[in-house]
Amino acid sequence: MERILDWNKYLDTAAKMVSEGIVMLKNENNALPLDADKEVAVFGRIQFHYYKSGTGSGGMVNVTKVVNILDGLIDNGIKVNEKLLDTYRKWDKENPFDLGEGWGGEPWSQKEMPLDEGLVKETAKSCETAIVIIGRTAGEEQDNRLEAGSYLLSDDEIAMLTVVRENFKKVVLLLNVGNIIDMTVINRIAPDSVLYVWQGGMTGGKGTADVLTGKVSPSGKLPDTIAYKASDYPSDANFGREKNRDIYAEDIYVGYRYFETFAKEKVLYPFGFGLSYTEFEIKTEKTEITEGAVKLSVSVKNIGSYKGKEVIEVYCEAPQGRLGKAARVLCGLEKTRELVPQEEQVVEIAVDIAKLASYDDSGVTGNKSCYVLEAGEYKFYVGSDVRSAEYACSFEQGEDLVTERLTQSLAPVESFERIKPVCEGGAFSIGREAVPVSEVDESARRLEKLPKEIAYTGDKGIKLWDVKNGKNTMDEFIAQLSDYDLSCIIRGEGMGSPRVTAGTASAFGGVSENLNGFGIPAGCCSDGPSGMRLDCGTKAFSLPNGTMIASSFNKKLTSELFTFMGLEMAANKVDCLLGPGMNIHRHPLNGRNFEYFSEDPFLTGKMAAAELKGMAGAGVTGTIKHFCANNRETNRHFIDSVVSERALREIYLKGFEIAVKEGGASSVMTTYGRVNGLWTAGNFDLNTVILREEWGFKGFTMTDWWANINVRGKEPDKTDLAAMARAQNDVYMVCPDGEKNDDNTLAALENGGIERCELQRNAANICGFLLHTNALKRAEGIGNTVKVINREDEEQEDDKPVQFYKVDRDITLDLSDVETKKGTSYSFALDLSNFGIYRVIVTASSTQSELAQIPMTLFSMGTAVGTFTFNGTGGKAVSMEKETPMFSRFTTFRIYFAQNGLDLHSIRFELTDKER
């Protein structure tokens, strides 16, 4: 079967997502939309260097072209002041964009051109409107900081914005950022219009220009509360204050849940806020309360003069009861179609009453470890943001109702105090209560839940596709696997495994010859949430970031966009995209917020489910990550998130739960760090009790790349795959070779550290996932291709003379002078005297962190030999090797560098005695 991926439609859908995700906070003095007949002045070097995404694995998408905001304006017919533009171009050439030092070392912002006031005044004479663009980035292993040029504006940016404000009649400020930044100085300078244009991927400039010119009216809404100061956020007192631990004392009161309950006066822009060029009238026309749902019919009428879309948000105010609740909690959302002036649409929203229950982790209601709908009045509010939403209806719950009985899981092992509301005179103040600690014997729980062992049969000729086709059962198939096979299948191979698409993150499943012989294919994983990361240099589509997607509040459009993403994955033989990222925006300084959706778990879960449904339409899927409470990048591989069980279940796990139950998630990645003292990679309660037993998850789980694993009370160890497998975390990502590794699996089988039945369970999970992949279809010989149409040919590198080196049996090339800057390539050729299998040894060093991922891919005659992914080496030379056949006298090689930060020393070729 051949399917079609229309690249033009892909581009258009992504640009539409950008235009719907932009959040306009302010628009005075008729600053926007722009007048097509008037010239504008554009300030800020980011006009040439649009940030398409943040940094790290979530942003390393190789693209042919990024449409920046300047391009978008010009393409939309806006005349840009040429003299100012030429001045910026000249300065930008003389002051190159600073790429930084590679993985986790990119600067948050760039140096800005000092503005000559005479030039500004002269430009203002011919331009009524000035557009100022400020950019920011952050990402993996790089949190934002409360300093100038990161969360705060730099002195250069303040000076630029000030002089422009003093001289121009209208000033439009565009924030090309991954997450919210400080607005204090911006408010003081008072531009007429302020828009968060986020990071919109490769079509970001087009979607942004569509909004600026009025082609599209902005309809994005804030997925986070913007407070006056960073210190106003309830997590601030416990974010990054300790090297190895963050205590979540704010508990369930994250973001607007805190501000609307305790501190409304600290909010500059409320959650869900966003302006349009038009105005809407929102009325709750009808409500119906049944035994299981609250149904609301809401009319939305465009009463302005521009066409546009509006978002309807439903919030619930639950009774305080004995547990304590947030003043308002998002429980429903829908987005209208585009409405022309005077057009009206009735939106239907149903709220599942059971989902309004709160988790009792202390037993104060008499129902410990249960979700409880406490007695009292449940009020519902409808509107376009949390603050302005108006009362719609209510119902009275006569008595406490248990909606779900569970068991204590993931509770903290150390006591601390958390926030709890105290009501005095109709207002809430902050009280404190002790957090319940764990009473669970984790080892005993694991032994109680051991599966039944399947008797070993040896090879019976059963292939995995026989299970798919109903010829044999999964148990019959798994019975064939030896202890050695079971030890191999829990290893992911990578990065850049030759078993799968070149330059991808890992292969899993069929990572040995024996496993391949059973018809187990090698599944393929590729980073990340913003598009496919192909470290061999292959170009892919860069998507808008997670925060922008959440800001759209458009589930339908999200699914449409990710159906295209899924087709692109299928075309590249990728089975799992390592995303969506689903962690909560607990604090605005988290560097990876750009990958994630929101401070709200309901919005997070709904948007993730929409992405997964879209990819499923193309026969592929995403891997929801990082499971769970990955809310800080600094020291992320050792950080302990100390959280109450209630906050975990209601906030930090809830989005994942929605993605599993509503989005059909079938692949999950755990974190680098700990939750309540135990590394998530080996956490039985997380990976088995909650994920599988409570939520009904049927897929497979994986660790993050080179993650630590531990047993309670013991030091972490990257080789303790037995602890990982016992927890029912199925695959360790990653090992250099799936057939041989220094892990402890086989030794643990011998000494009772793990049971064979547990490894069989892991294997069944992995194979059960592979049953539904395109990888298995290919292994079975079933055609399943994707034809890409309307995609322009990728730009080819300029032809450069290639030096040839004569080789008898071995050669070492000194590459210490080769430029290794991100995106560059180096080519050379060998003149061989002897043909055969050659060992390729690459030696390099890096001063980056030990978890930095610095890939370089070697191509032989246009085909990838493999990707050599170095970690930080502390400046010491490290060698990596692969093998490749060479049976042509003249063999040309190309090295592609996908990231900064690598110091290349040499490459050596050695003829082996292996036969072809």
How does the language model describe each region?
Residues 1-388, 408-850, 854-916:
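Glycoside hydrolase catalytic-domain context in secreted enzymes
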Residues 388-407:
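Short beta-strand elements
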